[in-house]
Design a protein with these regions (language model features):
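Acidic helix N-cap motif at the loop->helix transition within catalytic regions
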Residues: 16-19, 37, 72-73
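Receiver (REC) domain switch/active-site residues of two-component response regulators
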Residues: 29
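Acidic ATP/Mg2+-coordinating residue in the GHKL
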Residues: 35-36, 64
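Catalytic-site signature of metal-activated, phosphate-bearing donor transferases
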Residues: 44-53, 59, 63, 70-179
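Short, acidic/glycine-rich phosphate-metal binding loop used to engage nucleotide
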Residues: 37-44
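Conserved beta-strand positions in the Rossmann-like core of class I SAM-dependent methyltransferases
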Residues: 32
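N-proximal low-complexity "stem/linker" segments adjacent to membrane-targeting elements
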Residues: 1-26
Length: 179
């Protein structure tokens, strides 16, 4: 198995799930936690690129503080041949305490690159960030677990955060004031 670093992104107010750290430590000797109070970041991509830059290994697994690796995913990563530049991983979302198996938030539809070689990739995107990979992308089959929103209030806070990011990154055009 290749050496992997785990980069965990957390807001300054978030509580890191114990499962997040426990699962990260099962695949890595290098766990990096970056909060938005460490530096002022304009967007999530900047924060995730910063976290990857602090990782000591070339292979980086990206987690948010409200995510953890399923035991099946841990085993799959440990047996991986690392022949690709990156790997996409499905995500099983829990919203209001319930797993989501339908819509765009189902594991079949919510699949992204979260395991990547940082020498062959980087994060881009203002709000819904994604990894740009220079090379081929493999697919893992077992999901990481994501506890999105426990309450409606958390859901609304996230929407507000996304709209704030969008507003900060919009190019001002005075013509639209008159249309």
């Amino acid at each position: 198995m290749e050496f992997i670093s785990v980069a965990i992104i957390a807001t300054d107010k978030s509580v890191i799930l114990p499962q997040c750290l426990e699962s990260a430590e099962k695949i890595s000797d290098d766990v990096v936690i970056v909060t938005n109070s460490d530096h002022e970041f304009l967007n999530f991509a900047d924060q995730k690129n910063y976290a990857a830059s602090k990782c000591k290994h070339d292979w980086v697994l990206s987690l948010d503080a409200d995510e953890y690796l399923s035991p099946e995913l841990i085993a799959e990563i440990k047996n991986l041949d690392f022949s690709k530049a990156a790997y996409s991983i499905p995500r099983l979302n829990y919203i209001f305490g319930r797993p989501i198996f339908h819509t765009n938030w189902s594991p079949e539809n919510d699949r992204h690159v979260w395991l990547f070689n940082k020498t062959k990739s980087h994060w881009e995107g203002q709000v819904h960030e994604h990894v740009i990979v220079y090379g081929s992308i493999g697919q893992l089959h077992h999901p990481k677990i994501h506890y999105n929103y426990q309450t409606v209030e958390q859901f609304m806070q996230k929407i507000n955060q996304y709209t704030d990011f969008e507003a900060l990154n919009k190019n001002f055009n005075p013509i639209f004031m008159f249309i």
